[in-house]
């Protein structure tokens, strides 16, 4: 690391650790802490000497906005500068360097990679803390290694040390039903009744039903519109009566065309000239409430408490990025940066709603929500198509590339969309005029084939966060509804990428399963994606450290027994399809063992309650929120050294016995 520490030292940084891990910040004169401030610049010559020539190096860039796509790129004429926030990984021939911010709550910042070299900047908007002689930048780190996944794990542990603890020791593993992804803003009270009736009749095990944008009169006027004449308290009561937690969508910092903004113009976020700033959603501009103004903060608290008193305990909070997006903004409290304004606003929400409520922050700043959010969105809104530009492909990439943040919150990959539906929403429905709905005609459509739908559902499992569905349940095809068996209940373990830099979207993912049944050993689920347009089989690029049985739970077939160093080839996978394989460590003694079920992607991790084994039988008990048939498999040793697979079909809430004679 000496070449890097020497280069950083020449840039005037100050080290907290200067060994195999470089931790540092920079002391900046307060007169200079305005706008974009360079923290360091390491020239292309030094980077090349350290093993990272500008053009050949692959660069993984994390991204600030949920709608951006984290991923791996190289410099080109189209992308002469690659930017990342909060972290960037340089990769060249199994040689990796991670550079990232450790602190993420005081000011914005980003990293740049260009033919000139590696650069990091702090973004002080507005000018920082007038009256002080100097300020310190957020701490940063440089880590070096050969495995980018391990570097991100090391980085995550360091980020924990420099940021607030999560709001709770155990995040809620909710399964959420949401209305936006079919109805948009047009859902009515009667349609809610229809959804709840189907959830009850079909025993769909949802923890939360969330009412999305479209219930309110306007942004800032948080009272029900004409589609909800019985009121939102009654809607919450209906959801509770159906056995679920009431959830609701709000955007507390955006201001629509409402009287209170004219009555209290001082509550609006403005620039240095006093002009009220706006954030556009599509073509629609919205003014922004400034939570650093005490009166505005008190008003925000008042409507939050009113919604809480209606009975809502799950809050999807949207468009919070409006507080830090415009570098020209000057908060009422002129001693804070825009990122501190953002965190002040989110803190206001957390303190007002309390720990009883689950906060799902959508469209904010991931780092600055650490210690405040229960859930954050991992990517853009989902649609029921596969297209790379705006479909399932990119949503999976956004989700898995942000999985390292799972130590700080539960990820929300947005709703899984499984339906087959060629008809869009009718333009005659009541589209509330203050809400921008992109491509409303296609919002309710779904064109994923069976393989694509299964892969899109698999994204929820890979995320390891909450599971969310966005369907009109009265019309959902039964065979597509069964896909929910694979992800409900959530297992809560995010997947790790195996082939990080080998493909734009990695093909292989490992999920460590700690089974519900205490007598079963842990195992790994290896998920494989074929994002190509041709059917193909793939060679597993990872390694196994002990003999394992590789089992295909969906097909109830044994792929083989593999030792360290053996080549493991997947089954042929359809275009845009996936395979979920179970890697089971072989017992040291040759005796029968439980292999898998075909119910859930964990292959027995969440639904197997008990297992006991004798020389000739495997007995167990299943317990699931679903009432359905399940295939159960066990492995029995044969005298010739091979293994026999015995299967049985049983109910998902019953005992099972597997016998081999």
State what each model feature region is.
Residues 1-207:
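Carbohydrate-recognition beta-sandwich/jelly-roll modules
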Residues 131-132, 177, 199, 209, ...:
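Conserved, mostly hydrophobic/aromatic
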Residues 454, 460-463, 468, 504-546, ...:
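Carbohydrate-binding surface patches
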Residues 565-604, 647-661:
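C-terminal beta-strand-rich structural cap/linker in extracellular carbohydrate-active enzymes
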């Amino acid at each position: 690391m000496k070449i890097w520490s020497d280069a950083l030292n020449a840039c005037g940084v100050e080290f907290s650790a200067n060994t195999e891990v470089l931790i540092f910040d920079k002391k900046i004169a307060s007169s200079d802490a305005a706008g974009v401030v360079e923290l360091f610049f390491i020239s292309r010559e030094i980077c090349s000497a350290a093993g990272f020539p500008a053009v050949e190096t692959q660069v993984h860039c994390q991204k600030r906005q949920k709608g951006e796509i984290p991923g791996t790129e190289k410099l080109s004429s189209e992308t002469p500068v690659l930017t990342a926030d909060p972290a960037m990984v340089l990769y060249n021939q199994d040689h990796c360097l991670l550079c990232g911010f450790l602190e993420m709550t005081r000011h914005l910042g980003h990293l740049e990679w260009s033919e000139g070299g590696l650069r990091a900047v702090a973004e002080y908007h507005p000018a920082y803390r007038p009256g002080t002689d100097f300020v310190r930048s957020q701490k940063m780190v440089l880590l070096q290694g050969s495995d980018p996944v391990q570097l991100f794990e090391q980085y995550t542990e360091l980020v924990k040390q420099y940021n607030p603890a999560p709001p709770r020791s155990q995040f809620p593993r909710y399964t959420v039903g949401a209305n936006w992804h079919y109805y948009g803003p047009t859902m009515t009270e009667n349609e809610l009744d229809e959804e709840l009736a189907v959830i009850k009749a079909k025993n769909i095990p949802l923890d939360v039903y969330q009412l999305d944008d479209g219930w309110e009169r306007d942004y800032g006027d948080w009272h029900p519109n004409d589609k909800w004449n019985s009121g939102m308290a009654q809607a919450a009561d209906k959801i509770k009566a159906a056995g679920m937690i009431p959830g609701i969508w709000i955007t507390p910092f955006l201001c629509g065309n409402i009287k209170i903004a004219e009555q209290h113009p001082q509550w609006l976020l403005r620039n240095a000239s006093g002009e009220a700033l706006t954030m556009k959603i599509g073509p629609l501009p919205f003014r922004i409430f400034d939570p650093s103004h005490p009166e505005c903060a008190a008003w925000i608290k008042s409507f939050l408490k009113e919604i809480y008193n209606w009975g809502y305990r799950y809050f999807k909070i949207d468009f919070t990025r409006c507080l830090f997006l415009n570098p020209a903004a000057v908060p009422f409290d002129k001693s804070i940066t825009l990122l501190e304004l953002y965190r002040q606003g989110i803190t206001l929400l957390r303190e007002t709603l309390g720990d009883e409520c689950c906060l799902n922050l959508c469209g904010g700043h991931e780092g600055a929500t650490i210690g405040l959010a229960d859930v954050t969105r991992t990517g853009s809104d989902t649609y029921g198509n596969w297209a790379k530009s705006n479909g399932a492909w990119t949503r999976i990439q956004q989700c898995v590339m942000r999985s390292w943040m799972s130590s700080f919150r539960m990820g929300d990959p947005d709703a899984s969309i499984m339906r087959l539906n060629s008809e869009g929403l009718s333009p005659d429905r009541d589209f509330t005029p203050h809400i921008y709905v992109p491509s409303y005609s296609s919002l309710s459509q779904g064109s994923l084939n069976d393989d694509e739908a299964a892969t899109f559902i698999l994204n929820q499992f890979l995320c390891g966060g909450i599971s969310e569905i966005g369907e009109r349940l009265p019309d959902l095809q039964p065979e597509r509804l069964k896909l929910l068996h694979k992800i409900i209940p959530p297992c809560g373990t995010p997947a790790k990428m195996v082939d990080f830099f080998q493909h734009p979207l990695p093909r292989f993912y490992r999920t460590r399963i700690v089974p519900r049944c205490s007598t079963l050993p842990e195992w790994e689920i290896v998920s494989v994606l074929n994002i190509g347009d041709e059917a193909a089989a793939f060679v597993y690029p990872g390694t196994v450290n002990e003999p394992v049985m590789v089992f295909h739970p969906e097909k109830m077939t044994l792929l083989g027994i593999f030792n360290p160093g053996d080549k493991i080839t997947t089954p042929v996978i359809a275009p845009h399809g996936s395979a979920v394989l179970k890697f089971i460590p072989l017992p040291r003694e040759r005796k029968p063992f439980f292999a898998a079920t075909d119910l859930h992607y964990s292959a027995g991790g969440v639904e197997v309650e008990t297992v006991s084994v004798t020389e000739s039988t495997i007995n167990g008990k299943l317990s699931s929120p679903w009432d359905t048939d399940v295939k159960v498999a066990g492995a029995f040793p044969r005298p010739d050294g091979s293994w026999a697979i015995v299967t049985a079909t049983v109910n998902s809430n019953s005992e099972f016995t597997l016998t081999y004679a």
